């Protein structure tokens, strides 16, 4: 049976680049550069967001996740513990990836349509199936019940990669409106392991009707006593996580390259401006020297020299 996948990564806030990756806010050039990294821009339009109340909407690229976080906290009167710090210290964001075995997730997303997953293929004719929307809404409801709907900053479904999945961004805020990673998601070693096991168990109940069985996780399988199939499943999860991490870093590099190009253009413009000003200054100095020489030679009066300098 197909397996479910859950991966949770803590971060001390979120950068604009990370937000752009989650929300698919890319320039056309950046998206095209990612074709070789399991991204298909011709399927970008299939992605969607699940928002409050379980509503399916297009991905809102106009409000970044850091902006959403700031607005959310301000409305609730909660202070970001990393605000004002030279370097962020507190884990205020949980990035959760939810999905399952590739073939089953593709069936939910695309049904029996003939999707070409080769790099450079044109899949603009593909439509999104209702199955992935129903799974996403049930998964959103599960996360909302588990962590509080008010703590969900983004719940984005990506259908432009090799394996359809959810990127969910939540804040670990407790019932007292305080950030507490340990209370919500972590704790000491055994406590953290137990919470993750419970999360897997509860998510498996949601996934039953979608043909996804409870998956194994690193905390439970460890490095020993794995069957070949368990080891393959663990490797798939690790490869998927590392693939996403690498893609994120490539995206950051791509964006930095664009910023460097813009900066180089600005520097070139400023250099030209400085050169022009220096040339003008030198011409004026030459003109002053010429006027002073004419005055010393008696060809012009002091008044004439001053008047010409004023011009």
What are these regions (language model features)?
Residues 1-311:
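N-terminal nicking endonuclease/strand-transfer module with a His-rich metal-binding environment
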